[in-house]
Design a protein with these regions (language model features):
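Membrane-cytosol interface at the C-terminal ends of specific transmembrane alpha-helices
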Residues: 82-124
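Transmembrane-helix boundary motif in ABC transporter permease subunits
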Residues: 16-47, 59, 161
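Generic hydrophobic transmembrane alpha-helix motif, especially the helices
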Residues: 46-98
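Transmembrane alpha-helix signature in integral membrane proteins
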Residues: 2-30, 146-152
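Hydrophobic alpha-helical transmembrane segments of polytopic membrane proteins
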Residues: 21, 91-99, 168-189
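Non-cytoplasmic
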Residues: 149-177
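Transmembrane alpha-helices
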Residues: 131-160
């Protein structure tokens, strides 16, 4: 049945989107209120992590999970799905890491653009605090930009989900690709 793999993939996708939004917003808040040196360092780290291919990131997380298990005997993240078992935490973490930094960079760019606008200077002149200006004005005005770029983030996550399902032996939405006859694919095209 297609319903179970679809709901499993949808759960992973939803968890990834939720984790991505929460983490990217928290990173931006931390970044915004940090000293200038730390802000530059954080931007460089985000750029570096975003340049790592998703396949390598997935393997690194799997290896890290196995390394922790070998050292401590504690299985924090189940590295693969076997049989009818489903893994949830590892796919969500693996799918979230790169989109978190992509979304962080989108938010940061949008916040930088908003800071240049006149209403921010006016708010400072009125005596509003940096915190009030950020949460009440800047962050609220950046949501339009964030949601207009959401489609790129979603396509990136879906394409990574295809790779992840294969690497982690997940029985998700894209599992139908494994057992299809080439004639069936040709007819579908």
């Amino acid at each position: 049945s297609l319903k179970d793999p679809f709901s499993y993939s949808l759960l992973i996708l939803g968890g990834t989107l939720l984790a991505t939004f929460i983490a990217a917003l928290l990173f931006e808040v931390f970044h915004y209120f940090s000293p200038r040196i730390l802000q530059n360092f954080f931007r460089e780290i985000a750029f570096f992590i975003q340049s790592i291919p998703d396949v390598i990131m997935i393997f690194a997380i799997q290896l890290f999970s196995i390394w922790i298990f070998k050292k401590t005997g504690l299985l924090i993240l189940d590295p693969v799905a076997l049989g009818e078992d489903h893994v949830y935490l590892l796919p969500i973490i693996a799918l979230s890491i790169l989109p978190i930094f992509m979304l962080f960079q989108m938010i940061d760019l949008s916040v930088s653009e908003e800071q240049q606008k006149m209403y921010v200077e006016y708010a400072y002149a009125k005596g509003l605090s940096k915190r009030e200006i950020f949460f009440k004005h800047i962050l609220r005005n950046t949501t339009i930009t964030i949601f207009s770029n959401l489609q790129y983030l979603l396509w990136f996550i879906i394409s990574s989900l295809l790779i992840l399902e294969r690497l982690l032996n997940m029985d998700g939405l894209f599992s139908f690709i494994n057992g299809l006859d080439i004639k069936f694919i040709a007819v579908g095209l």
